[in-house]
């Protein structure tokens, strides 16, 4: 994994945060689009099929990295938080830090699963500001058009990758549709 950093102004003082993110190589860049080749990485995924009354799995995932796992071990936060964009169910995932790959703690929650995210090619569009349904749909349509123009074939549902905590101001936010 590579280190990703962002800077923000907070009451006049600069705050620096560093998080791991999956490793990838940019094969093609046509701003705001990129074609990336990701290396294998692991995720802990929340799927609301096991708990359909819950809208978001963020709390369940956060508890997992905060020691609610079978090893009772705290796990570092990483970026991005990944959400699968699907109409019939909600899936959200945290990326597992590379230091944990040899012994990934199993979740206590039946809504969570550890999965290997196999290497592969991903078309990506990057955008800033707060993300919402309308903006995500607009970005998804732009990405789908770019993918079609390049004559690529999507092999999975699109995903939203969020890189910032909710309190980060819009001008410093980074989001991606993959």
What do these predicted regions represent?
Residues 2-178:
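A solvent-exposed interaction/effector surface
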């Amino acid at each position: 994994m590579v280190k990703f950093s962002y800077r923000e102004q907070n009451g006049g003082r600069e705050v620096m945060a560093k998080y791991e993110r999956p490793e990838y190589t940019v094969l093609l860049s046509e701003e705001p689009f990129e074609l990336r080749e990701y290396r294998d990485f692991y995720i802990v995924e929340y799927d609301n099929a096991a708990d359909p009354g819950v809208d978001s799995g963020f709390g369940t995932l956060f508890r997992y990295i905060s020691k609610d796992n079978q090893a009772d071990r705290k796990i570092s936060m990483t970026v991005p938080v990944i959400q699968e964009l699907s109409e019939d169910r909600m899936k959200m995932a945290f990326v597992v830090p590379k230091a944990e790959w040899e012994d990934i703690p199993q979740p206590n929650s039946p809504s969570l699963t550890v999965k290997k995210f196999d290497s592969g090619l991903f078309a990506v569009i990057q955008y800033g500001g707060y993300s919402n349904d309308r903006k995500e749909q607009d970005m998804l349509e732009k990405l789908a058009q770019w993918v079609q123009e390049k004559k690529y074939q999507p092999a999975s549902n699109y995903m939203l990758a969020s890189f910032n905590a909710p309190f980060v101001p819009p001008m410093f936010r980074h989001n991606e549709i993959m």
